[in-house]
Amino acid sequence: MVVEQSGYVEVMGFKLFYRSFGAGDNTLLCLHGGPGCPHYYLLPLTKLANDNFRVVLYDQLGVGCSEKPEDLTLFNIERGADEVEGVRKALRLGQMNLLGSSYGGALALQYALKYQEHIRKMVIASGLSSVALTVSEMTRLKTQLPKETQEVMKKYESKFAFLHPEYLKAVDEYYHNFLCRLPEWPEDVKRSLNELSVPVYFNQNGPNEFTIIGTWKGWDITARLAEIKVPTLVTVGRYDEVTPKVAETIHRGIPGSVLRVFEKSAHLTMWDEAEEYLHVVKEFLAV
Protein backbone atom coordinates (compact mmCIF):
# COMPACT_ATOMS: atom_id res chain seq x y z
CA MET A 1 0.00 0.00 0.00
CA VAL A 2 1.37 3.42 -1.02
CA VAL A 3 2.13 5.76 1.85
CA GLU A 4 0.00 8.92 1.74
CA GLN A 5 0.52 12.10 3.74
CA SER A 6 -1.09 15.52 3.70
CA GLY A 7 -0.60 18.75 5.57
CA TYR A 8 0.49 22.35 5.32
CA VAL A 9 3.80 24.06 4.71
CA GLU A 10 4.48 27.75 5.22
CA VAL A 11 5.87 29.37 2.09
CA MET A 12 6.52 33.10 1.69
CA GLY A 13 4.34 33.85 4.70
CA PHE A 14 1.31 31.74 3.75
CA LYS A 15 0.12 28.20 4.48
CA LEU A 16 -0.10 25.92 1.46
CA PHE A 17 -1.84 22.54 1.43
CA TYR A 18 0.02 19.54 0.02
CA ARG A 19 -0.50 15.81 -0.50
CA SER A 20 2.33 13.32 -0.81
CA PHE A 21 2.07 9.78 -2.19
CA GLY A 22 4.80 7.14 -2.05
CA ALA A 23 8.28 7.34 -0.57
CA GLY A 24 11.93 7.69 -1.50
CA ASP A 25 14.22 10.49 -2.61
CA ASN A 26 13.07 10.49 -6.26
CA THR A 27 10.11 12.89 -6.37
CA LEU A 28 7.67 14.29 -8.94
CA LEU A 29 6.21 17.66 -7.93
CA CYS A 30 3.01 18.43 -9.87
CA LEU A 31 1.74 21.94 -10.60
CA HIS A 32 -1.97 22.39 -11.27
CA GLY A 33 -3.44 24.71 -13.85
CA GLY A 34 -6.20 27.26 -13.97
CA PRO A 35 -4.76 29.47 -12.77
CA GLY A 36 -6.79 28.71 -9.68
CA CYS A 37 -7.86 25.12 -10.40
CA PRO A 38 -7.14 22.92 -7.33
CA HIS A 39 -5.09 19.75 -7.47
CA TYR A 40 -7.84 17.10 -7.66
CA TYR A 41 -7.78 16.63 -11.45
CA LEU A 42 -4.09 15.67 -11.22
CA LEU A 43 -4.75 12.71 -8.91
CA PRO A 44 -4.27 10.11 -11.72
CA LEU A 45 -0.57 11.00 -11.58
CA THR A 46 -0.37 9.56 -8.07
CA LYS A 47 -0.59 6.09 -9.65
CA LEU A 48 3.09 6.57 -10.46
CA ALA A 49 3.91 6.55 -6.74
CA ASN A 50 5.51 3.53 -5.07
CA ASP A 51 7.98 2.69 -2.30
CA ASN A 52 10.82 4.26 -4.29
CA PHE A 53 9.05 7.13 -6.04
CA ARG A 54 7.12 9.98 -4.51
CA VAL A 55 4.43 12.14 -6.12
CA VAL A 56 3.58 15.48 -4.49
CA LEU A 57 0.61 17.71 -5.31
CA TYR A 58 -0.17 21.07 -3.73
CA ASP A 59 -2.71 23.86 -4.01
CA GLN A 60 -1.15 27.16 -5.05
CA LEU A 61 -1.74 30.32 -3.05
CA GLY A 62 -5.40 31.32 -2.98
CA VAL A 63 -6.52 27.94 -4.31
CA GLY A 64 -8.25 24.89 -2.85
CA CYS A 65 -7.25 24.17 0.74
CA SER A 66 -4.39 26.69 0.76
CA GLU A 67 -4.55 30.09 2.42
CA LYS A 68 -6.59 32.70 0.55
CA PRO A 69 -5.22 36.24 0.98
CA GLU A 70 -7.27 39.21 -0.18
CA ASP A 71 -4.29 40.94 -1.82
CA LEU A 72 -4.79 40.20 -5.54
CA THR A 73 -1.31 41.47 -6.43
CA LEU A 74 0.08 38.23 -4.96
CA PHE A 75 -1.42 36.19 -7.78
CA ASN A 76 1.14 36.35 -10.58
CA ILE A 77 3.33 33.83 -12.35
CA GLU A 78 6.66 35.34 -11.28
CA ARG A 79 5.75 35.05 -7.61
CA GLY A 80 4.33 31.62 -8.39
CA ALA A 81 7.76 30.41 -9.53
CA ASP A 82 9.29 31.54 -6.24
CA GLU A 83 6.44 29.77 -4.45
CA VAL A 84 7.32 26.49 -6.22
CA GLU A 85 10.88 26.89 -4.97
CA GLY A 86 9.54 27.54 -1.47
CA VAL A 87 7.51 24.32 -1.60
CA ARG A 88 10.56 22.38 -2.78
CA LYS A 89 12.61 23.69 0.14
CA ALA A 90 9.85 23.27 2.74
CA LEU A 91 9.28 19.63 1.78
CA ARG A 92 13.02 19.00 1.36
CA LEU A 93 12.59 17.55 -2.10
CA GLY A 94 16.17 18.14 -3.23
CA GLN A 95 16.63 17.75 -6.97
CA MET A 96 13.18 16.84 -8.22
CA ASN A 97 11.18 15.96 -11.29
CA LEU A 98 8.64 18.64 -12.18
CA LEU A 99 5.33 18.29 -14.04
CA GLY A 100 3.18 21.29 -14.89
CA SER A 101 -0.31 21.00 -16.38
CA SER A 102 -1.82 23.81 -18.48
CA TYR A 103 -1.11 27.06 -16.57
CA GLY A 104 1.04 24.82 -14.37
CA GLY A 105 3.12 24.06 -17.47
CA ALA A 106 3.71 27.77 -17.97
CA LEU A 107 4.58 28.02 -14.28
CA ALA A 108 7.05 25.13 -14.62
CA LEU A 109 8.77 26.93 -17.50
CA GLN A 110 8.92 30.15 -15.48
CA TYR A 111 10.40 28.19 -12.58
CA ALA A 112 12.96 26.49 -14.82
CA LEU A 113 14.24 29.83 -16.09
CA LYS A 114 15.22 30.76 -12.52
CA TYR A 115 15.77 27.47 -10.68
CA GLN A 116 16.56 24.75 -13.22
CA GLU A 117 19.48 23.45 -11.19
CA HIS A 118 16.88 21.86 -8.91
CA ILE A 119 15.11 19.99 -11.73
CA ARG A 120 16.08 16.45 -12.70
CA LYS A 121 13.53 16.08 -15.51
CA MET A 122 10.52 18.17 -16.52
CA VAL A 123 7.15 17.36 -18.11
CA ILE A 124 5.16 20.18 -19.72
CA ALA A 125 1.62 18.80 -19.95
CA SER A 126 -0.44 20.93 -22.33
CA GLY A 127 1.46 23.99 -21.16
CA LEU A 128 2.26 27.25 -22.92
CA SER A 129 5.10 29.69 -23.39
CA SER A 130 3.03 32.50 -24.92
CA VAL A 131 -0.43 33.69 -23.89
CA ALA A 132 -0.93 35.53 -27.20
CA LEU A 133 -0.22 32.43 -29.29
CA THR A 134 -2.46 30.31 -27.09
CA VAL A 135 -5.39 32.74 -27.29
CA SER A 136 -4.96 32.89 -31.07
CA GLU A 137 -5.14 29.11 -31.26
CA MET A 138 -8.16 28.92 -28.95
CA THR A 139 -9.93 31.48 -31.10
CA ARG A 140 -9.23 29.30 -34.13
CA LEU A 141 -10.68 26.27 -32.35
CA LYS A 142 -13.93 28.15 -31.75
CA THR A 143 -14.45 28.24 -35.53
CA GLN A 144 -14.69 24.43 -35.47
CA LEU A 145 -17.84 24.58 -33.36
CA PRO A 146 -21.32 24.67 -34.95
CA LYS A 147 -22.22 28.06 -36.46
CA GLU A 148 -25.04 28.62 -33.99
CA THR A 149 -22.66 28.05 -31.06
CA GLN A 150 -20.19 30.53 -32.53
CA GLU A 151 -22.95 33.11 -32.93
CA VAL A 152 -24.01 32.72 -29.29
CA MET A 153 -20.41 33.22 -28.17
CA LYS A 154 -19.97 36.34 -30.31
CA LYS A 155 -23.27 37.80 -29.11
CA TYR A 156 -22.49 37.58 -25.41
CA GLU A 157 -18.76 38.28 -25.66
CA SER A 158 -19.57 41.57 -27.40
CA LYS A 159 -21.71 42.47 -24.37
CA PHE A 160 -19.17 41.11 -21.85
CA ALA A 161 -22.05 38.92 -20.62
CA PHE A 162 -19.83 35.98 -19.71
CA LEU A 163 -22.21 34.60 -17.08
CA HIS A 164 -25.34 34.47 -19.23
CA PRO A 165 -26.80 30.90 -19.23
CA GLU A 166 -26.78 30.69 -23.04
CA TYR A 167 -23.14 31.74 -23.16
CA LEU A 168 -22.16 29.26 -20.45
CA LYS A 169 -23.89 26.49 -22.40
CA ALA A 170 -21.84 27.39 -25.49
CA VAL A 171 -18.63 27.43 -23.45
CA ASP A 172 -19.55 24.01 -22.06
CA GLU A 173 -19.74 22.70 -25.63
CA TYR A 174 -16.27 24.11 -26.28
CA TYR A 175 -14.93 22.43 -23.14
CA HIS A 176 -16.37 19.02 -24.06
CA ASN A 177 -14.55 19.24 -27.38
CA PHE A 178 -11.24 20.70 -26.28
CA LEU A 179 -10.88 20.28 -22.49
CA CYS A 180 -11.97 16.71 -21.75
CA ARG A 181 -13.51 14.39 -24.33
CA LEU A 182 -14.81 11.72 -21.97
CA PRO A 183 -18.61 11.44 -22.28
CA GLU A 184 -18.93 11.56 -18.49
CA TRP A 185 -16.45 13.81 -16.74
CA PRO A 186 -14.72 12.21 -13.72
CA GLU A 187 -15.62 13.49 -10.26
CA ASP A 188 -12.08 14.77 -9.65
CA VAL A 189 -12.25 16.86 -12.83
CA LYS A 190 -15.65 18.27 -11.90
CA ARG A 191 -14.46 19.00 -8.37
CA SER A 192 -11.45 20.96 -9.62
CA LEU A 193 -13.65 23.02 -11.94
CA ASN A 194 -16.40 23.52 -9.36
CA GLU A 195 -13.89 24.66 -6.74
CA LEU A 196 -11.98 26.97 -9.08
CA SER A 197 -10.68 30.01 -7.22
CA VAL A 198 -12.58 32.85 -8.88
CA PRO A 199 -10.33 35.64 -7.50
CA VAL A 200 -7.18 33.93 -8.77
CA TYR A 201 -8.67 32.95 -12.13
CA PHE A 202 -10.30 36.29 -12.92
CA ASN A 203 -7.31 38.34 -11.74
CA GLN A 204 -4.66 36.42 -13.68
CA ASN A 205 -6.68 34.97 -16.54
CA GLY A 206 -10.13 36.42 -17.17
CA PRO A 207 -13.71 35.16 -17.47
CA ASN A 208 -12.89 31.94 -19.36
CA GLU A 209 -10.15 29.96 -21.09
CA PHE A 210 -10.11 31.94 -24.33
CA THR A 211 -10.83 35.43 -23.01
CA ILE A 212 -7.55 36.22 -21.28
CA ILE A 213 -7.67 39.82 -20.10
CA GLY A 214 -6.01 39.34 -16.71
CA THR A 215 -2.56 40.23 -15.43
CA TRP A 216 -0.69 37.63 -17.45
CA LYS A 217 -2.24 38.46 -20.85
CA GLY A 218 1.10 39.73 -22.18
CA TRP A 219 3.21 36.89 -20.75
CA ASP A 220 5.58 35.35 -23.31
CA ILE A 221 8.86 33.58 -22.57
CA THR A 222 9.24 31.80 -25.91
CA ALA A 223 12.43 33.70 -26.73
CA ARG A 224 14.04 32.41 -23.52
CA LEU A 225 13.20 28.71 -23.87
CA ALA A 226 16.70 27.91 -25.16
CA GLU A 227 18.00 28.79 -21.69
CA ILE A 228 16.33 25.64 -20.33
CA LYS A 229 18.80 22.75 -20.38
CA VAL A 230 16.98 20.07 -18.35
CA PRO A 231 15.57 16.95 -20.08
CA THR A 232 12.01 17.90 -21.01
CA LEU A 233 8.98 15.98 -22.24
CA VAL A 234 6.24 18.07 -23.86
CA THR A 235 2.82 16.39 -24.04
CA VAL A 236 -0.35 17.58 -25.74
CA GLY A 237 -3.69 16.24 -26.95
CA ARG A 238 -4.58 16.25 -30.63
CA TYR A 239 -7.82 18.11 -29.72
CA ASP A 240 -6.20 20.17 -26.97
CA GLU A 241 -7.40 23.73 -26.35
CA VAL A 242 -3.71 24.53 -25.79
CA THR A 243 -3.00 23.16 -29.22
CA PRO A 244 -0.20 21.05 -30.73
CA LYS A 245 1.10 24.26 -32.35
CA VAL A 246 1.67 25.69 -28.87
CA ALA A 247 3.38 22.46 -27.77
CA GLU A 248 5.55 22.42 -30.88
CA THR A 249 6.68 25.97 -30.10
CA ILE A 250 7.91 24.82 -26.69
CA HIS A 251 9.47 21.68 -28.16
CA ARG A 252 11.41 23.69 -30.75
CA GLY A 253 12.53 26.16 -28.11
CA ILE A 254 13.96 23.72 -25.54
CA PRO A 255 17.08 21.96 -26.83
CA GLY A 256 16.77 18.16 -26.86
CA SER A 257 13.16 18.11 -25.69
CA VAL A 258 10.76 15.33 -26.66
CA LEU A 259 7.24 15.98 -28.00
CA ARG A 260 4.40 13.46 -27.63
CA VAL A 261 0.95 14.07 -29.14
CA PHE A 262 -1.92 11.97 -27.75
CA GLU A 263 -4.24 11.36 -30.68
CA LYS A 264 -7.48 10.76 -28.74
CA SER A 265 -7.07 13.48 -26.14
CA ALA A 266 -8.14 17.03 -25.50
CA HIS A 267 -6.53 19.15 -22.76
CA LEU A 268 -6.74 16.62 -19.93
CA THR A 269 -4.61 13.88 -21.43
CA MET A 270 -4.16 12.20 -18.04
CA TRP A 271 -7.91 11.44 -18.16
CA ASP A 272 -8.69 11.09 -21.88
CA GLU A 273 -5.90 8.52 -22.39
CA ALA A 274 -5.03 7.75 -18.79
CA GLU A 275 -3.21 4.44 -19.18
CA GLU A 276 -1.09 5.52 -22.14
CA TYR A 277 -0.33 8.89 -20.59
CA LEU A 278 0.95 7.39 -17.35
CA HIS A 279 3.02 4.89 -19.32
CA VAL A 280 4.71 7.64 -21.36
CA VAL A 281 5.46 9.78 -18.30
CA LYS A 282 6.72 6.77 -16.37
CA GLU A 283 9.06 5.78 -19.19
CA PHE A 284 10.40 9.31 -19.49
CA LEU A 285 11.04 9.63 -15.77
CA ALA A 286 12.27 6.02 -15.62
CA VAL A 287 10.24 5.46 -12.46
Residue positions per predicted region:
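N-terminal cap/lid segment of alpha/beta-hydrolase-fold proteins
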Residues: 1-15
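Active-site loop/oxyanion-hole signature of alpha/beta-hydrolase fold enzymes
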Residues: 57-103
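Conserved hydrolase catalytic core segment
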Residues: 94-137
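Flexible "cap/lid" loop of the alpha/beta hydrolase fold
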Residues: 121-162
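Alpha/beta-hydrolase
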Residues: 143, 151-230, 249
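Conserved loop-alpha-helix segment in the C-terminal half of the alpha/beta-hydrolase fold
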Residues: 215-265
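Catalytic active-site module of serine/aspartate enzymes centered on a nucleophile-bearing elbow/loop
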Residues: 256-287
